[in-house]
Amino acid sequence: MNLYIPKLGTKIVLTKDWSFTLIAEGRNKTLWDLLSSTPLPVRPWGIPFNRYNRPKLHRTLRKGSVLKFDRIYIRKEQGQHDSVTFKAEVRHTGVWYKVRFWVKLEDANNIEFERVN
């Protein structure tokens, strides 16, 4: 196995279906609203940000989906915040939608892909 850290803007195509956890958070709104039957939940008034247990969806993007690296966030001793943000065009009910979403680094590390030139 070779270490691969992509440049931002790099595109990859999924070579296998990829399952991941989508967390209810504003930056995931476009994909959440597309893949969920309910709108993105809002943190209830009075609950501190760090105590709010955000709802999650377990979803799968299909083989052949193209993802573009938009942001990679990794901080020393802050592993709970490590994440990768993608831009993608997702087909849903026969229509293509442009979305931007982030996933935890652990989920991103499970992607099987090929680089797009």
What are these regions (language model features)?
Residues 15, 23, 70, 89-91, ...:
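A structural detector for beta-sheet-dominated domains
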